[in-house]
């Protein structure tokens, strides 16, 4: 067992193989340490998020080392049967690759239960494994398909999996099931969770069904008839989303946190209008939005440095300040121009934006496509009951935000895979400035510089958990800086992660700006005794 640094609130446990990883994950899950916030199991690692205000990394490691997971842990196993029509387009090719008949491939797939090792790639996509590895390692397609139908049963490497929704993919398709791997109308949307036992049933020549127990329908948590519309969207801008603090305790289903990118600006907007800190608000990308006021309300705009305008019913335009409480009357209009610095504004409405929650949050996840859809023209913004205190007249705006062409310094914590890179490349990582490209979004910032980073370990990295702020290095050597909507697991080594105190700053870096990375001095020394 090896412990690797990830960030001030997270660490990576590296184990020898999948079997030991699953044993330890089940044990830690059942032990339920009060200061462990979340765990992301993967092929040979467990990413552990903890509360650094309650426990140090060293104390947590000491506790984990003292645990003695049992090899025969069977607690809370669910047994699920999934019926499959084995008519996938790649089935003959897989049989040829393995020097088997099609019948033999099917027989091997159904002859013993598979176990859900971890959830990754997409919500509800379980990586299923068997100790006997019945197919060895099945190669992925040379050219991934642009669209794979939901319910497709597939093989890749030592795993089998079922696509939960229509999506691109490079796995070999051997069959199809009609069961829903991901269904938000169920109490537990993900059909499969880590450590579940799955048995495939061949129903190629008869109708399919799926055995799922304890399925319940959810009910909406917002009664539309009780809501008060206060704003109407006249211009929706490039991307305007409802966001709050994000989702918690859903990583086991393959779902990320999402949530407001610049938490500081989001919290201040709510504070100014007297809301709870976690009240839902609007996140506006690159300005260009306009709203019509339908009922008396108080709002605040924070985040990027933008011109903000109030146009009254007589068409009189008044420029107003950000980080200030704004009392608006019916027929007024509120306009936020594209920013001069930064990239995201936050618009809080007294009472909070009211909308149905999905998996405990009002946030929209752009990768998983979960939560309230991006706002469009004529959408109505309704308020809830999140106001708990008096309105504050104003709050202090943050330090100067980055502009295109400028350089901003960002602290990083090295790890967990720093040793996979040549020492010269690590020096180059800190020496050169990295430009944020226009191929950047809530999933991640794509960076570029003249000299890509080179690896000294060339082997393929098994998928492992990644944190927000992780700097993953693909084969071209140009980093991808993962943000709030990033996939929970990744297959490229992570050189470093943005220190938690600089994540808000990163959320406001526009395309065309440059990042100068600095090594954060408080690196976790997990090897010290």
Feature locations, PLM:
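Conserved "landmark" site that anchors the functional core of diverse proteins
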Residues: 1-529
